[in-house]
Each structure stands twice: as C-alpha cells, then as structure tokens.
C-alpha cells in the first residue's frame, strides 16, 4: 500500500538477499514465495501493479507464475539459451512470462548476455522473439550506476544497428 501510494506501479520482491517475501536468485536458500509473499503478490495484482521477477530465485519465479493473473515482468536480465548464468531465464520461464502477457527485458551487462556487445543483446532478444514473439521482449538496461556496460544511452543506436543486423524488422524494433 505504501509503495502504491507513493506512485509505484511495478516492484520486485527480492534483490540480492532472501527476505520475508521470497527467495532471491542470489540468496542462500533461494526459496519460493513465503505466505506473506503470496499475499503481497495478490495485493499488488489487486491494485494493478506489475510484479517484477528480475532477481527472484527459480522457485520464486515458479510460484509467481502460478499465482499471476496479470502480466509479469523480468525488467532486466538475460536468457539461458544465449548466456548460461544462474540468474538468466530458461525457456520454460520465458514461456511462463509470455503466458501471463508479460515482458522480458534484456540487460546490457556481461552477466546478462555473457559479453557487453550490442550483438549479444540482439542475440538474446532474437531468442525470446523466436520462442514467444516480439511482444514479449524489450531492452532492460539496468542503468543504475552499479552496472558496467560498454555504452551509455547516447550510443543506443549501436543496439538498434545490432537488431537490424540480427534480422529484426523495422516493425519489430518499434514494437
């Protein structure tokens, strides 16, 4: 309620540690949603908020996807098919997010795409597009000052060019 009153319309339940709501992909236990976490997801959805699974453990992602009645988002991360990092989503999780009508944001840092090149970003986006459709993939930069990336926002044209080089149509890029 506090976050909603402050104007938030999307929130994640975890970051780098397990907490009273859910297990983090970076946590010690990496558990699923707690009973309180289940209540929070239901309350967020009742208010029209979007649940972000970006730092959730695999068990947490599975629990959220089972409960979801609204689109779920992974705001920033990668995909296992192109970068086998623990935090990245596997194909079943990608399909699960898409089944909610949700969106997967592809990050720009090495742990998301195993490299910092625009071509690696495009490769991950191409995988999601091929698996579930362009409407379920987006850029998920995570420009927060703590993430090391190859380029700043003034160089986003490099990502656009990489998308063109990877075969994305103008309509896909605008989607």
Outline where the language-model segments fall.
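Extended, charged catalytic domains and RNA/DNA-binding interfaces, predominantly
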Residues: 1-107, 111-113, 117, 122-129, ...
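Short acidic/histidine-rich active-site segments
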Residues: 107-108, 132-153
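Mid-to-C-terminal alpha-helical segments outside catalytic/metal-binding sites
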Residues: 151-175
